[in-house]
C-alpha cells in the first residue's frame, strides 16, 4: 500500500495505467483524493497526519493484492523516473497502511461545512478533469464561497462530491444538482455510481439514460 502525490490529471491517468501494468491486473485500490479533500482530512480538527506535503493537485492511494514491498518500491521508482508522480510514501506496517486508508475514509470531516450535498457519479476517465472543472465553475458562479470536496475510485470511473454552498433550501439544492448532473448528459455519464438511484436523483435520470433504459430500470425494480 502506498500513496503518491501528483501534479496533473494527465500524469494521474498515466499512473493508473502504469500501476495496473506493474501489478499485472492485481490492483485492488486506486483511490484518488483531490487537493481540497486531502487538505480537509489532514488539518485540525481532523486528527490525521499528512504523509505528503499539501501542494499536489491529486493524491492517490494504491493497493495491489499480494504485492511485495519490493514490487511497490519498483513500481514507484519507475513512476518517478517517468515523471508520473512527484512524491510518494509506502506503508511500512499495518498501522501505517491503516493511517493511509484513514485519510480516504475520513469523509465525516466534510460535515464541518454542513449543510452538505453528497453525490456519486460515474463517467469515463478521459472526461473527468473537464467535468470536475465545469462543475466547480458552475458552482462558483452561483455560490462564490462554495466548496466541493472530491474523491473517487478512479479505476471504476466513480467520483464522489461533498458540496457545501452555505445553505440547503430547495433553490440551492436545484442549482447544485443541475451543476453536477447537467454536464453528464454530453459525456454519457451516470448520476449514480454506487448507491443506486435515490428519489432525489430521479428527475435527472433522463439526462443520462434513454427513455427505454429508464422503463427497463423501472421493470427491474418491480
Describe each region flagged by the PLM:
Residues 1-222:
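Noncatalytic alpha-helical scaffold of FAD-dependent oxidoreductases
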